[in-house]
Amino acid sequence: MRARYRACILSLLVPLALQGQDIGLLRLNPETGGRGKADVYGGYEAGGYHPAFAPASLWKAGASAQGTRHGERTSFTGSFSFEQIDGKEQFTSMFLEPGYFPVDVLEFTPGDKTRQTYKLGGGFATTFAEEFVFGVKADYTAANYAKRKDIRHTTYGMDLQVEPTVAVVGDNGVGLSAAYIFRKRTETIDAEQVGAATDQSYFAFLDKGMRYGTYQVWDGDGIHLDEAGVGVFPVKEFTHGFSYLVEAPMFAGGMSLLWKHGSVGEKGYDWFRYPGFSWKVFLEGRFKGGHSLRLDLNLQNDQLEESVLDKVTAGGITTPTVYAWNAVSDRNWGSLDLTYAVRFLNGPLKLLRAVLHGGLWDEKSYLMYPYEDQTTRYNGMATLVAAFGFGPVDLNLRVNGGAGAWKDQGLSGGSDAVDSVPFRLTPDWLRKMEYFSTTKAGAGLTLTYHLPFVRGLYVQAEGTWLHGFGIDLLPGADRWSSTVKVGYDF
């Protein structure tokens, strides 16, 4: 049991370099037979220090299972998980992951929201010609996100990623792999109003970047939630790219380069489109005495364009026609992480890890010519993790702290010939910036007890706390969570 725990701890030192691309290296020193785990959990989270889209409080429950089996020449891996989250007093973004897409749709009536997420993963790697390995890994996520208070909405999401990989595995523990990456991600917002329409109709906001956009009745033409001929707000995104990974006993390194193209709309009603790219690279050195040092660099970009679209009617048939595309916003962001870790094979202290994180964002809005605006923001965070083992009890302690800053250029480029300025949802933007930039400190504790009478069975309790300093606009200065889990390693 302790050896198994130690193996789990040591795996923390070598996190997956590039999501999914480890499949080709399954054949690098494979264990005999294989291993797996399964767990169920439940938790609660509350507190006022949270982004506007997050709930005031939530309950969650879930289950997961994963396993890996090794044969003489082929290895298989698979996983499944389900999670349900019930949030209270939740509003603003209707998307599953606010901020991921360059557009957003916001509503303003707090209510209960339910999110269900299903994840499936699987893959295989097989050896041929002694040192060569071919593998394929696929990860699929399906989710739905529903609110049952006007304006009601159900958001459906699908995310599929497939990575065929070719690797070379040497007898000296060195592995090289290259993978092609394909990803398709879609989300569809289906909104409706059940209650009777009144003079106080429900409004929504279509964010086209930096909280500049359109604010009107939710089913108006400018929001696109209930456009004739479409009826929903669909987003689809395709990503292609490649990645490389080098794995050795004392060194690891990798790189991925991805290009994406997304669009908003369907059936000829193409309201927006956005190209983008991401570049990730990491380097890790492993030294004597269990020490390791890792550097992660991540750069991303996307550019949002809005169509000049008209509905042309001929012979009683209406056809949407796109005449041109106008740039309305672009985003550039990056992060740099430096991780130092050391493992201990003797004594109660098993792992010590320190992470320094820095992030930089640059956003521009060109929603209404000749105006433009720009925001630059950056943040830094330091995290310290210590893992202990005391017989059947494992203890994980985490502390972190950080701060950020931002600068808004303000609208520029106007002239006397322009009477109006682009609309901005300023209060929500300021709350977003306050959550991002405030000085914060947090802590976490995870306690795991391995039951002695059933090998592999454990019970785990976890608690976290986060505090923001100098809060002015957010509902509170603290956020806390607790989770209880029962699991089995096999």
Q: What does each model-found stretch correspond to?
A:
Residues 21-118, 123-132, 167-174, 292-294:
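Membrane-proximal, glycine/serine-rich, low-complexity loop/turn segments characteristic
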Residues 26-28, 48-55, 89-95, 146-153, ...:
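Outer-membrane beta-barrel translocator domains and adjoining extracellular loop/strand segments
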Residues 42-48, 82-86, 140-144, 180-186, ...:
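Transmembrane beta-strands of outer-membrane beta-barrel pores
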Residues 70-72, 127-131, 169-171, 239, ...:
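Outer-membrane beta-barrel channels and translocator barrels
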Residues 92-104, 180-233, 259-268, 311-318:
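Short, flexible helix-coil linker/hinge segments at the edges of structured domains or between repeats
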Residues 215-356:
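Long, internal scaffold/assembly segments composed of regular secondary structure
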Residues 478-490:
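Outer-membrane beta-barrel "beta-signal"
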